[in-house]
């Protein structure tokens, strides 16, 4: 999945003239997968100056970059649920790439499991911050961003994209080019978005029709051969 997501960054940069320019990508993220793909693209030579980590109230990544302490807290339920997590399973991959020390990774992961936190070494954090920054955008600001972009640009954002837009606006003035990765069609979060803009006409008709269909639930035994046979007979 991360390999596929790396293509997003090359595709976006192919659409602009970025030569000699300072470029920033802002990505809404909880599990650190999509933005890790951006880091890989940068390591491959793509002209990315900064990767901006956009978080919501569940701001463990923002707090880590600001303080070096990666500490778990209670998960807050927000309008951007894909960011509502505390353990970013891909973040340790970034740490490893900036220290190349598997024993250190095992040590901090043990601290996280046993104590609920770890502290990054200064030299590792400093190296990470050469590429990454991070901003936390809360739910009330998400709502105002969705309203603003609807009124000003006639663009309907889903809540995750609004988180990213908010984070980008905090930092974009420093760069020649600012690109924000969008997450999903707003119809995926119809109830949240429609309550903010007082309109639900943005939901495509084919999705409306799909949601009217009956659910089809099949319970299978926990057996790989049974699952394979079901897929062959009913789907493939």
Regions found by a protein language model. Name each.
Residues 1-236:
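PLP-dependent amino-acid enzyme catalytic core
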């Amino acid at each position: 999945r991360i390999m596929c997501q790396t293509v997003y960054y090359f595709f976006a940069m192919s659409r602009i003239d970025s030569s000699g320019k300072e470029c920033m990508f802002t990505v809404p993220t909880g599990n650190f997968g999509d933005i890790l793909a951006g880091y890989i693209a940068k390591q491959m030579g793509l002209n990315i100056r900064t990767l901006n980590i956009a978080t919501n109230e569940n701001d463990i990544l923002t707090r880590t970059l600001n303080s070096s302490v990666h500490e778990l807290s209670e998960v807050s339920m927000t309008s951007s649920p894909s960011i509502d997590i505390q353990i970013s399973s891909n973040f340790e991959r970034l740490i490893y790439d900036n220290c190349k020390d598997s024993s250190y990774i095992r040590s901090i992961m043990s601290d996280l499991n046993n104590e609920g936190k770890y502290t990054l070494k200064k030299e590792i954090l400093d190296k990470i911050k050469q590429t990454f920054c991070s901003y936390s955008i809360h739910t009330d600001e998400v709502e105002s961003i969705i309203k603003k972009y609807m009124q000003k640009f006639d663009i309907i954002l889903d809540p995750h994209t609004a988180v990213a837009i908010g984070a980008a606006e905090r930092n974009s003035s420093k760069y020649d080019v600012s690109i924000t990765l969008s997450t999903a069609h707003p119809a995926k979060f119809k109830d949240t978005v429609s309550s903010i803009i007082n309109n639900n006409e943005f939901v495509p008709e084919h999705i409306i029709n799909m949601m009217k269909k009956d659910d089809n639930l099949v319970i299978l035994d926990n057996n790989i051969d049974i699952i394979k046979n079901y897929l062959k007979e009913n789907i493939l």
